[in-house]
């Protein structure tokens, strides 16, 4: 403290010092009472508190579940030829879960769709009557396979506490159908 501050403090009357200290104590008491009574806004409640949520982390490439055997046609001519393949059988593929199952399948599929921008379905069917025509160069074989494409997504299920802290985490894998279609290739 400087000399002027010391002098100013020493020249205050004992009565003024009691009043300043009393005012400070009253302010602290008022703030404490307000906090205890809940007069100040409380921290917002965590929406995820007590819930398990699924966070997708890795997505596989599409894989085809075939509806019947592959079809083939050899072009033994000297020019390009067209061939038409027709689906003869049907296949229904349903989504499956391995690992942790604290989050519903519907909630996992919704989270996956939002993350990857793909429509993940609980079930899709590839049926007969679907045709595709391809061009086959001379001396090559055209091949076609019809069915349901699936994608496998691995992610983490997390249980959240009252302050939105992760309380527990578990791995979960979902394989889901994403579309029906043909795979064609030349050999």
Describe the residue ranges of each PLM region.
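Intrinsically disordered, low-complexity segments enriched in small/polar residues
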Residues: 1, 20-21, 27, 36, ...
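Secretory targeting and sorting signals
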Residues: 1-44
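Secretory-pathway extracellular proteins and peptide precursors enriched for disulfide-bonded cysteines
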Residues: 33-43, 54-55, 151-159, 172-174
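Membrane pore-forming effector domains from diverse proteins
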Residues: 121-174
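Extracytoplasmic low-complexity, Pro/Thr/Ser/Ala/Gly-rich segments
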Residues: 42-86, 175-187
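Hydrophobic alpha-helical membrane segments, chiefly transmembrane helices and signal peptide h-regions
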Residues: 27-37, 50-56, 60, 64, ...
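Membrane-insertion modules used to breach or fuse lipid bilayers
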Residues: 79-138
